[in-house]
Amino acid sequence: MMQQQMKTKEDSVKCLKDFENLYANDKSETIFTNLATLYGNLGMKEKQAQFISERLAQDPNCFTAWAVKGQAEMNDSKWDEAIADLKKANEIKPNALVLTWLGYCNNNKAANTQDANQQKALLTETQAYLEKAKELDPDQKEANWRYLLYNTYYNLYGADDSRTKAMDPNNK
């Protein structure tokens, strides 16, 4: 794809213009996702946020817009915002990758809290997300949920728990 050919700033600008022109004629979710991601990758965070907001104004139930918005917030370590937006995407359409991102955000939020009860609650919520991701994508073709689920089981139940052992990446 065009993005794979970007090696210089000029390549990036050309690719961006090409995607903007494509999007002007084709508002498909694929083009939207590529353009929104490209804005983020090029450090154009404000443009990315505006672009996503415009899409959500047109279609408040756009799974892709909520997922891309949540991913951008996750990449910026904005855990609460990412969790809220990824939950919206998941409500619209349950998706293994979105559920895995939710688990990742919750794990990071748990790691940054000193309150053991809050950590346990976050990890329990993470467990539910990742188990649903496992159910939707047992072969991990969409999302690599296994290690996160292993880590979650390990933190909740310890190394000797059968769930932890079953997810241990060394025991494939």
Where are the model-predicted features located?
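Short coil turns that delineate tetratricopeptide repeat
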Residues: 24-27, 60, 93-94, 138-140
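Short coil/turn linking the two alpha-helices of tandem helical-hairpin repeats
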Residues: 3-9, 41-43, 75-77, 103, ...
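Helix-start (N-cap) detector for alpha-helical repeat units in TPR-like alpha-solenoids
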Residues: 29-30, 63-64, 96-98, 141-143
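Terminal, low-structured helical/coil segments at or just beyond the last alpha-helical repeat
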Residues: 124, 132-172
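Single-residue signature of alpha-solenoid repeat helices
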Residues: 12-15, 48, 82, 119, ...
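Hydrophobic/aromatic packing residues within the alpha-helices of TPR/SEL1-like helical repeat arrays
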Residues: 16-19, 52, 79, 86, ...
